Amino acid sequence: PRRTPECAQIGCLHPCQRLTAKKGKWVEGVRETAMSTQETVRQQAGSVEASEALRLEQEKVEQLVEALNTDLAATYVLYHQLKKHHWNVEGAEFLGIHEYLGEAAEDAEEAADELAERVQALGGVPLARGAELEAAAPVEPEDDDVYDVRTSLANDMEMYGDIIEMTREHFELATNLGDHATADLLRDTLLDLEEHAHHLEHYLEDDTLVLESA
């Protein structure tokens, strides 16, 4: 049907326009326009585009992003191992260790989030896929078997120690490159890592109030 002169004068909608307007698309006559749904890649994985706002040289940013993505990968491997032990811990001291490992895993997840956000702020792309994270991590995760509590905690402390050494190196790198914000982030991360490693060391001491018969 055609739009009548009366409709044109009072601005009413042609039936086609009314039908299309309900779908959120306005047309002129029978011509319809729609928002493009074409997929766009804003930045390729592995690329670094130094932030103009932060004013750090491209070469320095590339080193920082590589280091932080390595930290990110290691932290996620640690997170998953802590969660594994949180789920599977048993024994007389179950509750306390179960709760502690849950808190440690939450701290690791929070640290990973902060590392990823710093990578993005610098102009990099944070690692996100599980396979990429595990491949980039300099620490070896425990296998899927369930071990006794002491072995599990010893493995966690070993991983914390490896990540502590790496974080110290990356703290020095950030400091030497003049990125004091990243250095401060890594310093705070290092303090948390050392606190958890020290806590695990206490759990693994021989002294206990629990009788062997328990």
Task: Identify the function of each model-found stretch.
Residues 55-63, 77-103, 166-181:
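Helix-loop segments that flank and shape redox-cofactor active sites
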Residues 117-118, 131-191:
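Acidic/histidine-rich alpha-helical segments that form the ligand environment
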Residues 184-210:
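Short, contiguous alpha-helical
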Residues 36-54:
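Acidic, low-complexity proline/glycine-rich segments
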Residues 83, 89-132, 203:
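Conserved alpha-helical segments that form or flank metal/cofactor-binding pockets of metalloenzymes
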Residues 49-71, 145, 149:
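Disorder-to-helix initiation segments
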